[in-house]
C-alpha cells in the first residue's frame, strides 16, 4: 500500500465515522421541521441555509462552514483534518445538494462569486447535451466548430437573457 492509498484509507474511515458525530446530528435537527405533505414515508424536511427552501433528507448535505474539513496530503495533516472534521455545530450548516455543488465549485475557483459559480454550473450541465446546445446555437445564428467556440457562444446567449 502506498502512502497515498494509506492516507485515502484514513480519510475515508474518518469521514465515515463523522456521520455519527453528535454535533453533525444536532445541525441536522436544528434545520428540520415535521413534513406535512402527501408522502407518508417522509417524516421530516430540512431547510437549505442558502436558498431557504425545504428538502427531504436525501437531498441535503452537511457542509463545514466557514472552514472546510480539508484533506490529508501527508501524515502531519491528520490532526488538523480531524480538528476541522469533528467540529461543533457553529461550524456546520445544511445545504441542498445543488447549492452545495455550486458552493464547492466557488471554493475551487478563488475570486468566483456564488452567482458566477451558479452560472458556470448551469453552463456545464447544458454543455453535456450536445444536441440541445447545437440546436440552441443554430437558432441564434451561431455555427461553431468545437466545444470552446460552442461554450463561448452559449455564454454570450445566456448572458443576454
Task: List the model feature ranges, each with a label.
Residues 1-52, 81-90:
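Short, charged surface segments at domain edges that flank catalytic/cofactor-binding sites
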Residues 89-161:
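A detector for short metal-coordination/catalytic motifs
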Residues 47, 61, 95:
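The −1 position to Zn-ligating cysteines in a subset of zinc-ribbon hairpins
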Residues 49, 73-76, 117-124:
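Short alpha-helical interface elements
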Residues 1-3, 7-8, 12, 16, ...:
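Intrinsic-disorder-associated interaction segments
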Residues 53-91, 107-110:
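Histidine-centered nuclease catalytic patch
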